[in-house]
Amino acid sequence: MHSLSERVEQLRLNDCPDWLYLLHEFDALYRQGSDGGSRPIRTHRKRVRDSLALIVEANPAVNDRPPEVKPVTAHLGRALDLGERGAVQGMSRALARVAGRLTWEYGYEKVPKALARKYAYCEILGPRGPICAERLILGFVLFAPSTTYPQHSHKDIEESYISVAGAWSENDAAVHAPGSLILNRPGLEHRITTGDLSPCLLAYAWTGSEERLNQPGMKLSSPRKARIEKGI
């Protein structure tokens, strides 16, 4: 006699309209936004779109992970409110519809105590689900106001971030507003700071090999290494 769990049919993407519509919003961001004349950004955007199109066409399995919150998710409601007023309203609304099903996490074995209260991320598509995929990861990262996310990098992973809400800066190079996209090439060391009045919500896409995306090896750089590389 089969158990109840064995008799329940595996959910697929087309059975879960809220997840599907959220992917539509990712597709719109990477299809309709500008590359600013940058060939690497243009290539990355196309890679994300093409990978996502193949995933959606395949109607992958959806494995709902147990919802999990972190201290910073107390700021999520405000971030979504701000997002609905900005350049990526559709993304903010679509994310709000699945907010109670998100699994927020840190990704590091050891997280500085101050950062643990101000940062978390959630994946919505990738090797661990909830929407199962092997060669692409999509998700969101949330920062509290006045956060400094220390120097770090991702080996063999190309990553892009699109602002949904809040103002932030990477490596003190510019201030990014909702709707803007930045691209980090594999291995690029980067440090993020956020404005002091509002939370910051970013949508992201990671591309890389199946092996690397399964084991991204997230690790904060040592302060000494960061200082040496900056010539300090």
From Swiss-Prot:
InterPro entries, A to Z: DMSP_lyase, RmlC-like_jellyroll, RmlC_Cupin_sf
SUPFAM superfamilies per UniProt: RmlC-like cupins (SSF51182)
Domain of life: Bacteria
Catalytic activity of the protein: S,S-dimethyl-beta-propiothetin = acrylate + dimethyl sulfide + H(+)
UniProtKB keywords: Lyase, Metal-binding
Inducers of expression: Weakly induced by acrylate and dimethylsulfoniopropionate (DMSP). Part of the acuR-acuI-dddL operon.
Binding site for a divalent metal cation: 154, 159, 161, 190
Cofactor(s) needed by this chain: a divalent metal cation
Catalytic activity, EC: 4.4.1.3
GO molecular function, one term: dimethylpropiothetin dethiomethylase activity
Family according to the record: Belongs to the non-heme iron-dependent dioxygenase family.
Note: DMSP is used as an intracellular osmolyte, predator deterrent and antioxidant.
Role of this protein: May cleave dimethylsulfoniopropionate (DMSP), releasing dimethyl sulfide (DMS). DMS is the principal form by which sulfur is transported from oceans to the atmosphere. The real activity of the protein is however subject to debate and it is unclear whether it constitutes a real dimethylsulfoniopropionate lyase in vivo.
Known partners and oligomeric status: Homodimer.
Protein name (Swiss-Prot/TrEMBL): Putative dimethylsulfoniopropionate lyase DddL
